[in-house]
Amino acid sequence: MADSAVPYSLGPSARASSTHRVATGTKQTSALKRRDASKRQAELEAALQRKVESERRAVRLVEQLLEENITEEFLKECGMFITPAHYSDVVDERAIIKLCGYPLCQKKLGVIPKQKYRISTKTNKVYDITERKSFCSNFCYKASKFFEAQIPKTPVWVREEERPPEFQLLKKGQSGCSGEVVQFFRDAVTAADVDAYGAFDAQCEPASSSTWSERASDERASDEEGPGFVSSLLPGNRPKAVGTKPQPHRQSSTVKKKAAQKMTSKHGEQTVSEVTEQLSNCRLDSQEKVATCKLPAKKENTQISSPGPLCDRLNTSTVSENKHSVSQVTLVGISKKSAEHFRSKFAKSNPGSGSASGLVQVRPEVAKANLLRVLKDTLTEWKTDETLKFLYGQDHGSVCLQPSAASGPDEELDEDDISCQAQNTLDETLPFRGSDTAIKPLPSYESLKKETEMLNLRVREFYRGRCVLNEDSTKSQDSKENELQRDPSFPLIDSSSQNQIRRRIVLEKLSKVLPGLLGPLQITMGDIYTELKNLVQTFRLSNRNIIHKPVEWTLIAVVLLSLLTPILGIQKHSPKNVVFTQFIATLLTELHLKCEDLENLAMIFRTSC
């Protein structure tokens, strides 16, 4: 009992001591926490201070790099305390103040181009010169990019524990680049891609017949909807084949039809070399099909079998394909629409290729007849009485020939021509030519007499001041006035201004061809311009007879010059005229014309209108 009563009596003191120990431990723990928190805060403030100081130091270095006379050692030291973004700011700021973007260069920037791209004819590449504009030369641009690539990308405030990198600078004399190369397409298909594609197909399961039939139908549909023009061989600028998922739809149609069927039948028995050999054979066979394919025509079916540019191109492409790798070229199919278009182009390019060239070429006789007919019609429309008065004076009727009434010396008139001529002469004598005026019946004599008396009476009353108009007549006059007010007429076209424009056009065209004709005559354009202008002012010009080809204008100038020769005072048998005659004869020979043709054109101005 005594033993058990001792702890019971010590209970309050023990509880007090334990409470004191707990309170003491809590105070110590809180003190440690406050100490750790203050320590962490101090460390955080120190880290933040280092970060701010590092950023300030980087900004100061950026400002110092904007100055001139920067040494290599200083630039290398700055590379440890800046980032690529800071260096880009240095380049931009130096470009703004018209300094070269490379800190070691002290040159000024000249005229900065405004374009974004530059095409190099030496390398056949397109360069993006957006960043290149900030440098004075290609070397400075390359040296700057070389130094920028060595700058660490880590934050500047964590580099104290890192090992400083060893910066290297480009030496002078090393070539630079014009900018970043613009990639318009991916790399071409290589032999490794073809081998990988063949090995993967050899491991794949054989495709079903329905799949190949669907692909064949798709290829036929694509052939029918082919492009407008065809090139037999194109450089193989296609994407590289992926090793896991090749895309057979992007390959050539011949590879789908022949090589794929053979590879699926043999599975994995074929090697890579055999697959490559089969691909080359398929391409050669498809070339023969393109060379001997039948081209559709509307009237008759023809086949290109004669030697021409197409056959030569296919032969050369076949030889080059045997020499080079198979994967460097890609075959393009030919469609029906493209074949027809190519056949027309082939016919135009080969003048002696049968009946197709006969449709394109025009015989010299036909061209000569058309030329003379156009010139004759034009000069006939131009000729007026004023033209004859200017050339031959007021009494041109005695000098000029009368136009023949008969249509031809050996032509006989039939009954229809005689009746037509009689009808024409009758129409000229009568005051009216048609039967439209005789549709209404003629008024009687009594009605005409009464109408005449009424008119005389109204005239007498008008002079006496007693004339009173009827309501119907006044209404009709008012309605006519209203109609005139409602429907204003447009101003007439100034025909004289139109003629002035046409005369100016004719004089400009003649002024372009006359200097070459006036050389043998040893006269200038100013000597004949006044007479030529006066002659053109007498022409009857329209919007159709002033449009001619250069050859036609040359012949027109020759005709007009022959008409103005007497007015200019050039004698017929003078040495100048003899040289001019020889020159004109040479010109007519080149145009497949004769002197008689030129005389016939000049005879138009020697006949009366």
Curated annotation (Swiss-Prot):
Catalytic activity: O-phospho-L-seryl-[protein] + H2O = L-seryl-[protein] + phosphate; O-phospho-L-threonyl-[protein] + H2O = L-threonyl-[protein] + phosphate
Molecular function GO labels: protein serine/threonine phosphatase activity; RNA polymerase core enzyme binding; RNA polymerase II CTD heptapeptide repeat phosphatase activity; zinc ion binding
An example Gene Ontology CC term for this record: transcription preinitiation complex
UniProt-listed InterPro entries: Rtr1/RPAP2 (IPR039693), Rtr1/RPAP2_dom (IPR007308), Rtr1/RPAP2_sf (IPR038534)
Keyword terms of this UniProt record: Acetylation, Coiled coil, Cytoplasm, Hydrolase, Metal-binding, Nucleus, Phosphoprotein, Protein phosphatase, Transcription, Transcription regulation, Zinc, Zinc-finger
The keyword Metal-binding belongs to this UniProt entry's keyword annotation: yes
Name of the protein described by the UniProt record: RNA polymerase II subunit B1 CTD phosphatase Rpap2
UniProt source species: Rattus norvegicus
Lineage: Eukaryota, Metazoa, Chordata, Craniata, Vertebrata
